[in-house]
């Protein structure tokens, strides 16, 4: 490759990071809610992801539970600071809800999990830049895509100008305004509340109402206008959930925002993080129990069948980044305090389902569609189109919350056929001949490790103090998208990981802990990049110094590509 081309490749992530920063500044200046939503420690976290933590003088043995992006980021910054880190992952792969499907025949990719990052997520952009990942534009909106409701089909550039043509009996003051503008009309009262009450009190008020209550009540929208928002903007997924959560989500998810994606697939992010680690990453290693003592934490993991033996690892500190349902399956001794148990039970995960269909050619290009999404009131709800020159693997359906119920319980074949029917209804029967008969379905509510797509809280039924997951329980710390705002985004998981890492790095641990012969710090020093879980029932990680343990399903960067799933 020519030197000039190499220089350009190096500059791509830097330039995109600068563009994202400028886009964020422009969007922030226009969004009156941005200041209220902004994390007070955001700039500090940005510095940590850029420069790392201060080098520790007292390395600690840290066990990170979960190899999703939160666990991997925390492991990286703690390892870089000099701590001895081991990651335990119950699944047979890394990445968590970052899950890239790769078609073995065509090379086309589809994102079963995370697929975009808004320009306001500067921490995530900086992380990708630091790992050498190339970013490019994610097309959220294309004016030539379609909206079909009540058997009326219009191009989205028409819907933006005259949404009443879809058949909604809008009030005179609602007609001629885009769905986004109608939503902003409803937020006028919320803006007044922000100015009168301040962010803290206003958000507490918003947490007590559903989005539907607010839009019809204080928002003073007509029922047809609210139905329009539900059909066209998928706001119906929030209708019975907290208005505060809807506000947070809308600050990151709008067709008017700018988004980026990772060139080559989002799974390159966890792979890049993995390659930067020096400690153990154990797969197929579900944590079943934790016992805190005065000097360390004993972590029990279950080995793979048929033995199902328990093994014990010791650490000075544990960071729990697993999903809420996974954490609830762990036995804690002493038990988690009541307020933490209640906080875990309060976590409300909504289902999320994606259905991809593979076609022989990108037929949507003939309709001048080069990305973005179409909307339908049929079961598939949202259809996302891949960018030009990236194949014909179509995200034929993306549903979440109550809308995902349409695909629950269906067989893989039934789910594919249902999505195909909806695509054919929108684009014509010719798509049936163009479908190559293959596809992939991912239902996150049925994933045994996440048991849900992401967290969105319902209204608070009574006044409670906000759950503060940044406060550790003894030697146990918490991170993950469920522990911070806004829920459901990769950057949120990263922010939570950085906060936990800062606290762990500043913790004053006894020097003797780091050299304990009963711990596993010595194993980590001797083994370097060993990935897998011990398969021998009698193998004791704490006693194997300077040698590689037997591994089961050894992980490498080459075998993390994903085959078709039947979920």
Curated annotation (Swiss-Prot):
Its cofactor is FAD. Substrate binds at residues 116, 398, 488-489. Primarily found in immune tissues, with the highest expression in lymph nodes and spleen. Present in germinal center macrophages and inflammatory myeloid cells and antigen-presenting cells (at protein level). Also present in spermatozoa (at protein level). Highly expressed in primary mediastinal large B-cell lymphoma, a specific subtype of diffuse large B-cell lymphoma. Expressed by neoplastic cells of several B-cell lymphomas and by tumor-associated macrophages. Its EC number is 1.4.3.2, 1.4.3.25. One of its GO terms (cellular component) is sperm midpiece. GO terms for molecular function: L-amino-acid oxidase activity; L-phenylalaine oxidase activity. Residues 553-567 have a biased composition (Polar residues). Glycans are attached at residues 54, 134, 220, 559. Coiled coil: none annotated. Residues 506-567 are annotated as: Disordered. FAD binds at residues 69-70, 89-90, 97, 113-116, 287, 481, 488-493. GO terms for biological process: adaptive immune response; amino acid catabolic process; L-phenylalanine catabolic process; L-tryptophan catabolic process; L-tryptophan catabolic process to indole-3-acetate; negative regulation of T cell activation; negative regulation of T cell mediated immune response to tumor cell; negative regulation of T cell proliferation. The keyword Transit peptide does not apply. Residues 1-21 form the signal peptide. Pathway: Amino-acid degradation; L-tryptophan degradation via pyruvate pathway. L-amino-acid oxidase activity toward phenylalanine (Phe) is specfically inhibited by a number of Phe derivatives, such as Cp3 (ethyl 3-(2,6-dichlorophenyl)-2-(piperidin-1-yl)propanoate) or Cp2-SO4. Cp3 is a very potent inhibitor for activity toward phenylalanine but is toxic. In contrast, Cp2-SO4 is less efficient but not toxic and is able to reverse immunosuppressive action of IL4I1 in vitro. Keywords: Adaptive immunity, Cytoplasmic vesicle, Disulfide bond, FAD, Flavoprotein, Glycoprotein, Immunity, Lysosome, Oxidoreductase, Secreted, Signal. Disulfide bonds join 36-199. Pfam families: Amino_oxidase. Induction: By IL4/interleukin-4. Expression is up-regulated in numerous cancer and metastasis: expression is induced by immune checkpoint blockade. Belongs to the flavin monoamine oxidase family. FIG1 subfamily. PANTHER family: FLAVIN MONOAMINE OXIDASE (PTHR10742), L-AMINO-ACID OXIDASE (PTHR10742:SF21). Secreted L-amino-acid oxidase that acts as a key immunoregulator. Has preference for L-aromatic amino acids: converts phenylalanine (Phe), tyrosine (Tyr) and tryptophan (Trp) to phenylpyruvic acid (PP), hydroxyphenylpyruvic acid (HPP), and indole-3-pyruvic acid (I3P), respectively. Also has weak L-arginine oxidase activity. Acts as a negative regulator of anti-tumor immunity by mediating Trp degradation via an indole pyruvate pathway that activates the transcription factor AHR. This is L-amino-acid oxidase. It comes from Homo sapiens.
